[in-house]
Amino acid sequence: MTNIRKTHPLLKIINSSFVDLPAPSSLSSWWNFGSLLGVCLAVQILTGLFLAMHYTSDTATAFNSVTHICRDVNYGWLLRYLHANGASMFFICLYLHVGRGLYYGSYTYSETWNVGILLLFAVMATAFMGYVLPWGQMSFWGATVITNLLSAIPYIGTDLVQWIWGGFSVDKATLTRFFAFHFLLPFIVAALVMVHLLFLHETGSNNPTGIPSDPDMIPFHPYYTIKDILGFLIMLTALSALVLFSPDLLGDPDNYIPANPLNTPPHIKPEWYFLFAYAILRSIPNKLGGVLALVMSILILALAPILHMSKQRSMMFRPLSQCLFWLLVAVLFTLTWIGGQPVEHPYIIIGQTASVLYFLIILVLMPATSIMENYLLKW
């Protein structure tokens, strides 16, 4: 008798995706982050759903409703901090997942890669709108500053900003619509994840060597299921430690002050996971130029398949490209640090140097190094 998991219309889809899926035998721990992102999304949707049961999206009561969740709802504090720090874990896994894709040349699966970029934008939009909901000082001013960037778009900019605000400033209408979109977007993200996996399973996974692994495949279950479960345990332990020992470590103390349109915080800055892009935005004195650089700092990932000049797919056997890759990582850490600093000397010039280096490495140095490595292969 044939196993039901191979014949049932629904179970056979799950079976071909998670059980009998042929996978390369050499996948390292860098391939764990896809499944970790799935767990992060599940945690965020579940905690978010329970938070939404107690939250009110009204300027008069939003801040107090979050306080009520933390003080009066059973384990409300746990839900709130799991959700807030879960977002940080989500972005840590996201950036590591993207970094893995860049290092091992996974971007050559262009459909999977492009859906991944769409996912990154969708998650960033979701996180930004979620940050506005507690209606603290940094929520309000962050929303004001970031939405105001759209006014740099020629001709339609001002109208567009007022249309998004639902008025002439960030107010009740803005908060209500941000809550609506923040609730909706994770489900769109979940749908995009399905498309991402669909495209991935069309080609099969890449592997650390970048060499086709068709002759040497193993079933996903039990080898990679047990490996993924170990990853889940490590990540959930880290998240639990963060939530239970220092839940406010990654947050901004200004967000414990209720939003006040008449009082601007001394340093307006987004959550830590947007600081690198914020630093690139601030490094350009022109408003429109800054906005374009901000968008391009993420959209540049879409150029990765075009900029790939090497005859080898992975960086595993390309030491010069490896050096550049880790220099890029160092530049990103520098940008993240600068994004959290005030706009004054020497931070301005450091930020501008790091921003130039960021684009220079990706657009010029990496392709040039790849071409040079191709010549070295002939020797």
UniProtKB/Swiss-Prot annotation:
Any extra detail in the entry? Heme 1 (or BL or b562) is low-potential and absorbs at about 562 nm, and heme 2 (or BH or b566) is high-potential and absorbs at about 566 nm.
Checking InterPro entries in the record gives: Cyt_b/b6_C, Cyt_b/b6_C_sf, Cyt_b/b6_N, Cytb/b6-like_sf, Cytochrome_b, Cytochrome_b_C_euk/bac, Cytochrome_b_N_euk/bac, Di-haem_cyt_TM
Protein task: Component of the ubiquinol-cytochrome c reductase complex (complex III or cytochrome b-c1 complex) that is part of the mitochondrial respiratory chain. The b-c1 complex mediates electron transfer from ubiquinol to cytochrome c. Contributes to the generation of a proton gradient across the mitochondrial membrane that is then used for ATP synthesis.
User: Which parts form a coiled-coil structure per UniProt?
Assistant: none
Q: Which CDD domains match?
A: cytochrome_b_C, Cytochrome_b_N
What residues does a ubiquinone bind to?
201
For this entry, the protein name equals Cytochrome b
Organism from which the protein derives: Chiroderma doriae
Listed transmembrane segments: 33-53, 77-98, 113-133, 178-198, 226-246, 288-308, 320-340, 347-367
Any one GO MF term held by the record is: metal ion binding
Cellular component terms (Gene Ontology): mitochondrial inner membrane; respiratory chain complex III
GO terms for biological process? mitochondrial electron transport, ubiquinol to cytochrome c
Superkingdom per UniProt? Eukaryota
Binding positions (heme b b562): 83, 182
